[in-house]
């Protein structure tokens, strides 16, 4: 789905059949890229609320992999003055079910999904979060595999017989089948689609013509999609793809195209890579050239929106009257946003009987569990997005630069490549460019010991030996247990900086803080180029640094290669926020950083 809100399109007959179906209708909608899926979902919700009389927040649930889908749906519903439904990622809704059962969501997201599935299987009655549902909308069902597939199928069994389903997907964009290799469950996307039609009574529908493609080459991609869907032989499909790519504009190596990616105001560009390693290389090159960009994260790594700390942080809690929350929101947001944000907070909290108050403790638990609905997470605001092809699903851009992979697994089958390339090609509205990276003297590979990627260079002294030059900076490498401060700058000043910072994608440096470092691990302050402190590295970063660079006689005073992805709200111990002079609610801001952390060995 698009992450923008273009003018409302006129629905064709196929789309109208989906939109105007009764609330108890169950449909499996085959929705190709650019066929107006966002508009159909928005109009479907509008019809369910306005024509069928459903209550958006209680009786409609939308489950999606994509924040872009949620942003688009929310924006377009606001324009039409239609209340937004409960919209979550599959992982977030699993955490909500666990919290509702008094189980603290712990461990990996895969573990939470399995625990929530077990909870549903063992339940003697429908959980409160499901019991009131009268319609469920499932987005990108072609990517439901393994544990998440089992979770959704188990959830659907608890729906009332007269509850409807609108499931949307496109088998040609199914690119997550590889996850089955490491999954305990072997339920495939094909199994999900068969269950939807055979077990849950979904009828199959389509959406008709393409509405996304505007440029000449993107329109050729639309035609390719039709040919691929009519092809059953993988090698034949690959030949069709290669014939099209021969006509694609070629921009050469990154030195020839890096300065072309920044679009004019109001437009968006994507640089799409096959592997995480290539994403890290592209991001570092753009970082070195001071090209502002954001690296697309997995859905689980989108934290709470920054305005939450700004609004709720000063409030004492644990329960606040609506009037006090709205007054706090008015100090931060435009007047017409206040009602919307209150409703989103209240919907997330789930205490509908206490309609005139907000439980800050409940909001805190949701943030800690990373179980907030997607409208309350911090969006990607950069006009240039660097992403793997897989994480770009559901997004659309004006221009797309597709980077040829520097590595592919041996024995990759034809359909895997075709589906991946089709997803990349079909993200563009106006222009598509093929480009590449040069041959590098270093290699980037996953390190299981570190739990992250690292960059290795060949040793000049020992033939065949390598040494680590940099390692990936992860989501958890920023300290979140307390508000950051330094001997020179207090926590309140850093919070003010984070609250006003609007330069997402800027370069960030890590500077050694000797006063907070120990013999076991270093601590680095995260600062902008003009020396504004943003945060501090975590114990996890210090441990990874020590494992990787502990051999150095002296610790480097500067680490570069980093950029700011977003500023987000975290929830922690109220005593920490009180100690920092930020109130007793336990909410504060942290930066989210990405890149290849590269110690400057000249500063050791």
Predicted regions span which residues?
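Conserved helicase NTPase motor core
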Residues: 9-33, 86, 95, 100-185, ...
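Short glycine-/polar-rich loops that comprise or flank the Walker A/P-loop
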Residues: 56-59, 161-163, 170-171, 199-204, ...
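Conserved RecA-like helicase ATPase core segment
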Residues: 153-248
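Conserved interdomain hinge at the start of the Helicase C-terminal
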Residues: 250-267
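Conserved active-site motif detector
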Residues: 447-604
């Amino acid at each position: 789905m698009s992450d923008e809100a273009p003018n409302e399109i006129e629905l064709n007959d196929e789309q109208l059949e989906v939109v105007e179906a009764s609330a108890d209708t169950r449909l499996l909608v085959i929705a190709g890229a650019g066929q107006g899926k966002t508009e159909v979902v928005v109009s479907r919700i509008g019809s369910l609320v306005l024509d069928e009389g459903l209550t958006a927040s209680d009786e409609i649930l939308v489950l999606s992999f994509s924040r872009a889908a949620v942003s688009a749906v929310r924006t377009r519903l606001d324009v039409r003055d239609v209340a937004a439904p409960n919209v979550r990622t599959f992982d977030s809704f699993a955490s909500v079910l666990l919290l509702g059962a008094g189980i603290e969501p712990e461990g990996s997201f895969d573990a939470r999904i399995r625990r929530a599935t077990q909870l549903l299987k063992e339940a003697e009655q429908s959980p409160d979060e499901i019991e009131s549902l009268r319609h469920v909308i499932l987005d990108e069902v072609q990517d439901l595999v393994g544990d998440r597939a089992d979770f959704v199928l188990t959830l659907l069994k608890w729906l009332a017989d007269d509850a409807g389903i609108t499931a949307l997907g496109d088998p040609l964009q199914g690119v997550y089948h590889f996850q089955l290799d490491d999954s305990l469950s072997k339920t495939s996307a094909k199994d999900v689609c068969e269950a939807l039609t055979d077990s849950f009574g979904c009828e199959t529908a389509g959406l008709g013509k393409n509405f996304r493609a505007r440029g000449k080459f993107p329109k050729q991609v639309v035609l390719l999609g039709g040919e691929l869907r009519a092809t059953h032989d993988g090698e034949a499909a690959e030949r069709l793809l290669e014939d099209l790519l021969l006509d694609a504009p070629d921009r050469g190596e990154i030195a020839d195209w890096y300065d072309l990616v920044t679009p004019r105001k109001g437009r968006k560009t994507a640089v799409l890579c096959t592997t995480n390693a290539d994403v890290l290389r592209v991001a570092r090159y753009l970082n070195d050239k001071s090209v502002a960009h954001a690296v697309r994260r997995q859905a689980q790594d989108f934290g709470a929106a920054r305005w939450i700390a700004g609004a709720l942080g000063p409030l004492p809690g644990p329960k606040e009257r609506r009037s006090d929350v709205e007054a706090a929101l008015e100090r931060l947001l435009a007047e017409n946003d206040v009602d919307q944000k209150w409703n989103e907070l209240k919907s997330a909290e789930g205490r509908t009987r206490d309609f005139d108050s907000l439980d800050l403790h409940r909001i805190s638990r949701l943030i800690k569990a990373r179980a907030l609905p997607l409208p309350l997470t911090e969006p990607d605001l950069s006009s240039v997005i660097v992403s793997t092809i897989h994480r770009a699903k559901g997004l659309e851009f004006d221009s797309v630069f597709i980077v040829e992979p520097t590595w592919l697994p041996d024995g990759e089958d034809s359909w895997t490549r075709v589906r991946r390339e089709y997803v990349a090609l079909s993200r563009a509205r106006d222009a598509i460019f093929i480009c590449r990276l040069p041959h590098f003297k270093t290699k980037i590979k996953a390190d299981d010991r570190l739990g992250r990627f690292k960059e290795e260079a060949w040793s000049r002294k020992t033939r065949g030996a390598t040494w680590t030059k940099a390692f990936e900076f992860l989501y958890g490498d920023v300290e979140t247990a307390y508000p950051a401060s330094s001997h020179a700058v207090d926590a309140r000043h850093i919070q003010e900086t984070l609250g006003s910072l609007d330069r997402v994608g800027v370069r960030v440096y890590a500077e050694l803080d000797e006063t907070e470092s120990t013999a076991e691990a270093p601590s680095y302050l995260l600062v902008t180029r003009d020396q504004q402190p943003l945060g501090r590295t975590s114990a996890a970063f210090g441990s990874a640094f020590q494992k990787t660079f502990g051999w150095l006689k002296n610790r480097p005073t500067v680490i570069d290669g980093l950029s700011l992805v977003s500023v987000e709200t975290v929830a922690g111990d109220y005593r920490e926020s009180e100690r920092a002079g930020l109130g007793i609610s336990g909410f504060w801001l942290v930066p989210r950083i990405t890149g290849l952390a590269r110690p400057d060995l000249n500063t050791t």
